[in-house]
A protein has these predicted regions:
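N-terminal intrinsically disordered/low-complexity leader segments
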Residues: 1-5
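Helix-turn-helix
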Residues: 9, 13, 17-51, 55
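Flexible coil/turn residues that form the inter-helical turn or adjacent wing/linker of helix-turn-helix
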Residues: 24-25, 147, 174
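Hydrophobic/aromatic residues within well-ordered alpha-helical segments
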Residues: 49, 60-64, 85, 89, ...
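Hydrophobic alpha-helical connector segments
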Residues: 55, 59, 69-95, 154-155, ...
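Amphipathic alpha-helical packing segments from all-alpha helical-bundle domains
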Residues: 62, 69, 113-144, 153, ...
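C-terminal peripheral helix-coil segments that are non-catalytic and often amphipathic
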Residues: 91, 132, 136-140, 160-193
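Amphipathic alpha-helical segments used for helix-helix packing
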Residues: 93-118, 167-168
Length: 193
């Protein structure tokens, strides 16, 4: 088994365990058992459970922003970009709602203790830089009022609004309604020229 394969097995097992249990309920023994990888090997790749969960969060968010950057590159039409990003979130939610549940669960659990709170704040700063790159790629946006706003602020606001709908529902054990996400797209489309 190659190193990448072992690391992927560990991450996949962690994804499944964190889906079923909270971060604090999950153990490295659970992950070792499910992945078939010995615990010392897990610690070789991930010195702590916090490091493992952080890597998992980072990979999920990185994939989201890579896809958003890909969408932005496909068209210069702002309204089309908005529609495509909202559609991407809807498809991701329908195909893999587990991703959002894990992100919400780990994020919430991390904020409960100082040691993990520091780690997640470092991670959010790193991810914010990825989001800024996508926002810079988005380019300046002219609002319907005529005011210009950076693509970074516009994209940040839209992603935050979509995330709020998704995570609020996930936290309540509900699946977000497609129409609620479409409304966010409509609001942002109406806000641009």
């Amino acid at each position: 088994m190659g190193n990448i394969n072992k690391k992927e097995k560990i991450l996949e097992a962690a994804r499944d365990i964190f889906f079923k249990k909270s971060f604090y309920e999950a153990t490295m023994d659970d992950i070792a058992l499910l992945s078939g990888v010995k615990k010392p090997t897990i610690y070789y790749y991930f010195p702590s459970k916090i490091d493992l969960a952080s890597q998992l969060l980072e990979l999920n968010v990185k994939k989201i922003f890579e896809k958003i950057s890909e969408i932005i590159s496909k068209t210069n039409n702002i309204k089309q970009r908005i529609k495509m990003i909202v559609d991407f979130y809807i498809n991701l939610l329908e195909e893999n709602s587990k991703t959002f549940i894990i992100m919400q669960r780990i994020g919430y659990d991390f904020m409960q203790k100082e040691d993990s709170k520091k780690k997640i704040n470092e991670l959010f700063e790193k991810l914010r830089k990825k989001q800024k790159k996508a926002g810079d790629l988005f380019g300046e946006v002219i609002l319907s009022s005529g005011k210009k706003v950076s693509g970074d602020i516009f994209l940040y606001s839209m992603v935050a609004a979509l995330g709020r709908i998704i995570f609020e529902n996930v936290a309540q054990g509900r699946k977000p309604k497609k129409n609620d996400l479409l409304v966010i797209g409509d609001i942002f489309s109406a806000s641009v020229k």
